[in-house]
Design a protein with these regions (language model features):
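RNase H-like (RuvC/DEDD) metal-dependent nuclease/polynucleotide-processing core
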Residues: 1-236
Length: 236
């Protein structure tokens, strides 16, 4: 949130349930089964945490004005721009994210938060892909090796202890960049002593929050078309 003194992170959670609980309200009871997002409940928890209305929602999931059944123009454009930096996009499908994406986009739209593609409008929703976002936020040349389940892919010739050490070091480096750009990120992202998917998910959530802040400051660009777009921060 920006209270007039610049952006700062108020809260970050690895799951919907944890986010609602962090708000300190009964909103945790509104989450549907933990894995299925509830747009109304998420907005209510966010309002409780920041003490005001929510201007922009950033989502780390393929979204589109029309049902997603395969690769989109936005996926092709992101891959064209960032594929050489190992941050291309995997193809979405009717199964993944499928109905989950369509339902979430429709829920937010019904609450007045339309999906932004060619221009930013508030209140609104934007799609974020953390890999290219981190490339631009850090200024590094390639996709950062920060996914907990891919250490063998990143460092195939190293033993597990060394791979874990490198992963934790990468997490620490990313947190440093995020804290410098969004105060409060460091407190929300205390690097664990062993890799956890929960930490990785919380890190992605903070990246999305920072991209949303940059968007509200006019420091992003949209890669896509009228149906879908991935919003990427400008370098620096």
């Amino acid at each position: 949130m920006d209270d007039g003194e610049g952006w700062r992170l108020v809260a970050a959670s690895a799951s919907y349930k944890a986010f609602h609980a962090f708000a300190g309200h009964a909103f945790a009871e509104l989450a549907r089964g933990g894995m299925v997002p509830d747009a109304g409940a998420l907005l209510a928890s966010a309002r409780a945490l920041c003490g005001g209305e929510v201007d922009l929602v950033a989502v780390d999931m393929p979204l589109g004005h029309s049902p997603i059944v395969g690769r989109r123009a936005s996926d092709n454009l992101v891959s064209r721009v960032y594929g050489g930096r190992k941050a291309g996009v995997h193809s979405p499908s009717a199964e993944r994210p499928g109905a989950l994406s369509d339902g979430l986009r429709a829920e937010f739209a019904a609450l007045g938060y339309g999906l932004c593609t060619t221009e930013l409008r508030t209140p609104g929703v934007i799609e974020v892909y953390p890999h290219p976002a981190l490339i631009e936020l850090t200024g590094l040349p390639l996709r950062l090796p920060y996914k907990a389940g891919k250490t063998l892919t990143y460092w195939p010739g190293l033993d597990r202890a060394t791979r874990v050490s490198r992963l934790l070091d990468t997490w620490g480096m990313i947190v440093g960049y995020l804290e410098a750009a969004l105060p409060g990120a460091g407190a929300a992202l205390v690097v664990p002593t062993r890799p956890t998917k929960a930490f990785e998910d919380r890190l992605d959530a903070v990246v999305c929050a920072l991209v949303a802040a940059r968007a509200l400051d006019g420091r992003v660009r949209a890669l896509g078309d009228t149906d879908s777009a991935v919003w990427v921060p400008l370098a620096g």
